[in-house]
């Protein structure tokens, strides 16, 4: 690996397990990584050159830390909520930042995102008017079920599916508790195909790197649907380019996106796409791991280079991207856990020598406890397997193989795994 940045210091905001691969790549590039977050036990800190407990929301504390360490660059990890801090810290230090205040305003708050999308003909999920006062005239207009969620949190945090008014009012309280801005939205609960659209931006050029179909669990009634797996490329690619792409690119240009990566999560129904969640940073889904294996370039290296130089490198993103994955079929396979303490994990060891598995990003280990308030969020993910096969049928067989093999037992002897992805739906 190129080590042209040997000895440079990079401050990375956020320490969750999904940020660990970013830290590891920077380490491999010879960079001195400094990870900071509010929890001393965060996973990514174990891989860092240095670690601090300055919370990612403490902008003044982050600026002070960056100055004391004389860092050469700052980069946000896999956390939507830290993108505003990233922008402010870089601005105060005069360091490269792929986000701007306008971009942060649009992509860090779901209500502002939806408002912006509609101006460009990019649809958001149908929404009901409701504020913290929960006025009777507004409540009477709501048709259930609905999804209640904070405008400024992700990964399922603070989200509730409500089937009646009592559950709605409880969901409002939960969403407000999880919102730093104390704002929430109430949307129609969509029961249709779920998709992710992942973009790469370089010097103002927008490239669609991948589009995938998400398959979520319906086992946890009343909670946000957590992903069971994603399949690449999506069966809805043609409809995307026919019905949404041009409007989306026009919106990105007017917002002022020049560099970086962006995921738009959405639903597909009757030929139309309804966007519900943007993420202007590397994703927990980590499609960049599949892209590294298939496209041959690594978005992590690209963003690290930008943080240290203000340039993502000398290449044409349109020449190396391929939204159709060069004819391959790929997937991320998520294993979700029920509440309990992990006593035993088996079946994952075979992934180490399986050429179909390009990565295994494990979040939890023996001795860890899945708490009640983790249910319905990505914190209940045991691990994600990244699979690449030559055909869709081979991919389905690989998924079945690992779902039959992987076992997780709690300290009271119970099976902790939720039901997996039904490959008949692929």
In which residue ranges do the predicted regions lie?
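ATP-binding N-terminal substructure of ATP-dependent carboxylate-amine bond-forming enzymes
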Residues: 1-103, 134, 310-311, 337, ...
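A conserved helix-loop-beta module that forms one wall/lid of the active-site cleft
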Residues: 91-158
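Conserved ATP-binding module of the ATP-grasp superfamily
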Residues: 123-125, 145-148, 159-192, 212, ...
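Short beta-strand-to-turn element immediately C-terminal to the catalytic PLP-Schiff-base lysine
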Residues: 130, 159-164, 200-202, 269
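A short glycine-rich, hydrophobically flanked beta-strand micro-motif that places a catalytic Asp/Glu
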Residues: 187, 258-270, 318, 417-422
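ATP-dependent carboxylate/phosphate-activation module, predominantly the ATP-grasp catalytic core
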Residues: 188-191, 195, 199-257, 261, ...
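A glycine-rich beta-turn/hairpin centered on an aromatic-Pro dipeptide
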Residues: 312-356
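A structural supersecondary motif
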Residues: 351-370
């Amino acid at each position: 690996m190129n080590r042209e940045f040997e000895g440079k210091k990079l401050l990375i905001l956020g320490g969750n397990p999904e940020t660990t691969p970013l830290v590891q790549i920077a380490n491999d590039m010879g960079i001195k990584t400094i990870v900071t977050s509010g929890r001393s036990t965060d996973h990514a800190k174990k891989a860092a050159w240095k670690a601090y407990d300055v919370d990612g929301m403490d902008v003044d504390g982050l600026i002070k830390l960056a100055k004391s360490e004389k860092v050469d660059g700052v980069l946000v990890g896999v956390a939507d909520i830290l993108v505003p801090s990233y922008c402010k810290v870089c601005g105060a230090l005069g360091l490269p930042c792929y986000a701007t205040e306008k971009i942060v305003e649009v992509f860090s708050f779901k209500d502002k995102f939806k408002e912006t999308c509609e101006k460009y003909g990019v649809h958001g999920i149908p929404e009901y008017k409701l504020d913290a006062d929960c006025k009777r005239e507004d409540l009477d207009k709501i048709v259930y079920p609905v999804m209640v969620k904070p405008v400024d949190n992700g990964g399922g945090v603070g989200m509730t599916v409500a089937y009646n008014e009592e559950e709605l009012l409880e969901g409002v309280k939960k969403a407000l508790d999880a919102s730093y801005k104390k704002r929430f939205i109430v949307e129609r609960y969509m029961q249709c195909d779920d998709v992710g659209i992942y973009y790469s931006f370089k010097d103002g050029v927008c490239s669609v790197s991948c589009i995938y179909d998400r398959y979520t669990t319906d086992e946890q009634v009343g909670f946000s649907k957590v992903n069971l797996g994603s399949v690449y490329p999506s069966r809805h690619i043609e409809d995307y380019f026919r019905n949404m792409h041009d409007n989306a690119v026009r919106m990105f240009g007017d917002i002022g996106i020049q560099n970086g990566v962006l995921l738009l999560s959405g639903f597909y129904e009757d030929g139309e796409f309804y966007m519900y969640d943007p993420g202007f940073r590397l994703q927990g889904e980590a499609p960049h791991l599949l892209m590294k294996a298939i496209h041959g370039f690594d978005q992590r290296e690209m963003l690290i280079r930008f943080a240290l130089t203000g340039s993502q490198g000398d290449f044409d993103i349109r020449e190396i991207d391929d939204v159709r994955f060069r004819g391959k079929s790929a997937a991320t396979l998520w294993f979700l856990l029920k509440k309990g303490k992990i006593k035993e994990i088996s079946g994952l060891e075979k992934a180490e020598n399986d050429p179909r598995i390009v990565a295994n990003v494990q979040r939890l280990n023996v001795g860890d406890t899945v708490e009640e308030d983790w249910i319905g969020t990505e914190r209940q993910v045991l691990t994600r397997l990244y699979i690449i096969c030559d055909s869709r049928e081979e991919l389905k067989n690989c998924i079945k193989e690992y779902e039959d093999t992987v076992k997780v037992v709690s300290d009271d002897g119970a099976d902790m795994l939720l039901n997996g992805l039904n490959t008949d739906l692929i």
